[in-house]
Design a protein with these regions (language model features):
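A non-catalytic, helix-rich entry segment at domain boundaries
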Residues: 1-96, 159
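Nucleic-acid nuclease catalytic cores
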Residues: 98-103, 108-169
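Compositionally biased non-globular segments, especially hydrophobic aliphatic-rich helices
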Residues: 40, 169-173
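Acidic, low-complexity intrinsically disordered tails
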Residues: 1, 5, 152, 162, ...
Length: 175
């Protein structure tokens, strides 16, 4: 595998690119993905480079998104996968209400309109164990907030998909 320079800008572009594919703003055709990735690189005031080890490569970014969308776990969810979904929760503890808000990168909903699977795209090149634990906790919080059954942490660069299950059962809960 080619060396890839990670970083915040790469993550922003990958998230935006995959969001635009899911919303239909950009097609999955390779040329369209490359062109849009190059536009996004330039919008950050950078110039696209050929070698992803030295900067932001439109070809590498487009290929990463295409590979991610083709992963079996993601391909199976694609027909109902919604991008950038706000999640909220309020919890009262000892008379103090705490509100939590976030944005799930993508999720699916069941026939009843309730979230089923929460997907979190991660662009890290080689995350360490502590980072992965943080990601699991983040997705578990989204599961608890939404009542979704399971979450997927998708490490886009490596193509690894990690399953996260909710901490509490959502079966039979009163609505």
């Amino acid at each position: 595998a080619a060396l890839v320079q990670g970083g915040r800008e790469r993550g922003l572009i990958l998230h935006k690119l995959i969001e635009e594919v899911l919303t239909g703003e950009v097609t999955e055709a390779e040329a369209a993905l490359i062109e849009r990735a190059a536009d996004l690189i330039r919008s950050l005031g950078r110039s696209p480079v050929a070698d992803p080890a030295t900067g932001l490569s439109a070809d590498e970014l487009a290929a990463c998104v295409a590979r991610t969308l083709a992963l079996p776990d993601i391909a199976a969810l694609r027909p109902g996968l919604l991008a950038e979904f706000p999640v909220y929760a309020a919890q009262a503890t000892d008379g103090v209400e705490t509100a939590t808000a976030g944005i799930a990168d993508a999720l699916t909903v069941g026939k009843d309109g309730r979230p089923v699977v929460v997907v979190d795209w991660k662009s890290d090149v080689n995350p360490d164990a502590q980072t992965l634990d943080h990601y699991r906790a983040q997705v578990r919080a989204y599961l608890d907030m939404t009542g979704a059954e399971r979450g997927l942490i998708v490490l886009m660069t490596s193509g690894t998909v990690m399953l996260v299950l909710a901490t509490k059962s959502t079966e039979g809960e009163a609505i």
